From Swiss-Prot:
PANTHER family: PROTEIN ROOT UVB SENSITIVE 6 (PTHR12770:SF20), RUS1 FAMILY PROTEIN C16ORF58 (PTHR12770). This is Protein root UVB sensitive 6. Belongs to the RUS1 family. The gene is RUS6. Pfam families: RUS6_N (PF24162), UVB_sens_C (PF24160), UVB_sens_prot (PF04884). Required for normal embryo development. It comes from Arabidopsis thaliana (Mouse-ear cress). InterPro entries: RUS_fam, UVB_sens_C, UVB_sens_RUS_dom.
Amino acid sequence: MPSVKLTHHSPPDTIASDSVRLLSRETLRISASLASPPVDDLPPHSPPPPDSQFLHSTLRLICCEEIDGRRFKYVAESDGSGRFKKNSVRAISLESPQTPFDEVGSFLRSYVVPEGFPGSVNESYVPYMTWRALKHFFGGAMGVFTTQTLLNSVGASRNSSASAAVAINWILKDGAGRVGKMLFARQGKKFDYDLKQLRFAGDLLMELGAGVELATAAVPHLFLPLACAANVVKNVAAVTSTSTRTPIYKAFAKGENIGDVTAKGECVGNIADLMGTGFSILISKRNPSLVTTFGLLSCGYLMSSYQEVRSVVLHTLNRARFTVAVESFLKTGRVPSLQEGNIQEKIFTFPWVDDRPVMLGARFKDAFQDPSTYMAVKPFFDKERYMVTYSPTKGKVYALLKHQANSDDILKAAFHAHVLLHFMNQSKDGNPRSVEQLDPAFAPTEYELESRIAESCEMVSTSYGVFKSRAAEQGWRMSESLLNPGRARLCHVKEGE
């Protein structure tokens, strides 16, 4: 661009014209630089550099985040001296709002296709499910006629309005159960990660449904709503049982005999069910107390269910078994065996309750409320595909995953989070405690947090490989961990780029 000579006296119109052209050219240059950041310097689809994007604003870009295809950028307010104001982090969506049609489509996809579809299944999935849906359509239609026929066979008149009402009520009850089964199927991914916990929770629901069914005897005028509620609960339990059955049988099979193992397992269950039916017929002749009988049978059912899932030995590490393994390693230097790890796994925890002290794959807004904390922690993880931090207000350790994180990075992030939790517990009272005992009131200073993170980084660099090798020696399949991380991924933007 030619230099502008200030001593040259041009006519006013010429000076104004030159100024306009110069201003327009500079505006276009700045706009182009903002719209097209250098590909080699910035991550793909990265937002514009913070200094240029907020040139005349106190807001500064910290990082960007992607979750389920939606992208967000996080900004914080500067106080003018280069420091950030506390609790000034704000999330700005980079996506236009979804139309109602798109929202309905996303809602339906979350129920009828697996996560990651179509990449998570092979090409035969779609034709199989298409024909399966058609089969169930005809089966559902046939069910109405079979129900009416059965009711007529036991004495209900075909032309009676009462029999028609009974048939409709019965069909509505079954329909409500199918709706409940469909709604709970959205939790399908959790069946892979926490199958023991979900299996036991399903058995609890089964007994709850049985109790609601028995309650219809006390309030017969509420038969339909109670029967519908009971059928919903019992169908949810049935989904849980069906979805967790195959992984459990797979753990027993040593070769390509999973079909045989499954068939024999179901046969054992059916034989025991028939024996239980015969037993109930015998004792029902004596007219025992309904409440007492239900209480005793339910206790036996739930105790057997608990011991059933507790006896399963799985070779993979979900969050519960991973916690057992890491805690043992940090305290004793050894990784528990498969039998020990599975026995110590907690069954009375429900995957949909987020009360764990370690949050894996968390969102940025949950992990960081103070932007200065993020800027202080970030340099420790520049060479990693994750980062960990501790939130004193929530009493939890958060592991955030970067966009390129693979399965080993997720495993390492989870290990690092537990190590940091171990150090935070030590800083509180000098004695390492269980991860379930973290005190939310403990609020370390920023310097203390940096010190603990530095210590954890040093320990992870020397002990993570040792942990993996010792876990593999015990038979744990480290390459098939089921840690169920959150779907949020960070895309970092460095200041000044």
